[in-house]
């Protein structure tokens, strides 16, 4: 929205700031806070670009929480729960190939591995837990409320065990 000068689908009424600019300006204004929350949904960018974006927060001297991490396991990233179905099979790939459960697990593992490698990132949270009730239609770690696990769920548990996180 910042690059487009918009508030969702409306024209912005005043100059926009990126989240990083906003946090930096809070610090410059002397606002007392401990943690910067960053959302990291799949952004159609290379993972390296996402890492660079996250690393910009390190220079601000605040702990970071990745408050919302997410990607779909089918369809398009922009296919939100409240929109009509998009003919995604006719669309270009967003990241490596069309989204599927294994690619969602790869994205989860990549982002959480980056977060685990940065001591100033104190927490990372996967946003959608169960389909179809999430922000992304297929963004959950479970396929349904009945508890059918996706590859990303198993990958998350494996990482947790590997890193000995409680």
Description of each model-found segment:
Residues 1-88:
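Noncatalytic carbohydrate-binding groove/subsite architecture in carbohydrate-active enzymes
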């Amino acid at each position: 929205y910042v690059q487009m000068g918009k508030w969702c689908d409306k024209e912005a009424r005043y100059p926009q700031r990126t989240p990083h600019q906003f946090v930096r300006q809070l610090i410059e204004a002397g606002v007392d806070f401990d943690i910067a929350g960053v959302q990291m949904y799949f952004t159609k960018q290379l993972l390296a670009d996402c890492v660079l974006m996250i690393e910009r927060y390190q220079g601000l001297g605040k702990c970071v929480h990745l408050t919302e991490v997410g990607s779909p396991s089918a369809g398009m990233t922009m296919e939100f729960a409240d929109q009509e179905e998009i003919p995604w099979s006719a669309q270009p790939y967003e990241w490596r190939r069309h989204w599927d459960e294994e690619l969602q697990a790869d994205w989860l593992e990549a982002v959480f591995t980056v977060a685990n490698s940065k001591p100033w990132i104190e927490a990372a949270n996967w946003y959608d837990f169960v389909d179809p009730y999430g922000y992304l239609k297929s963004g959950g770690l479970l396929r349904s409320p009945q508890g059918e696990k996706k590859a990303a769920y198993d990958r998350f548990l494996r990482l947790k065990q590997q890193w000995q996180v409680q």
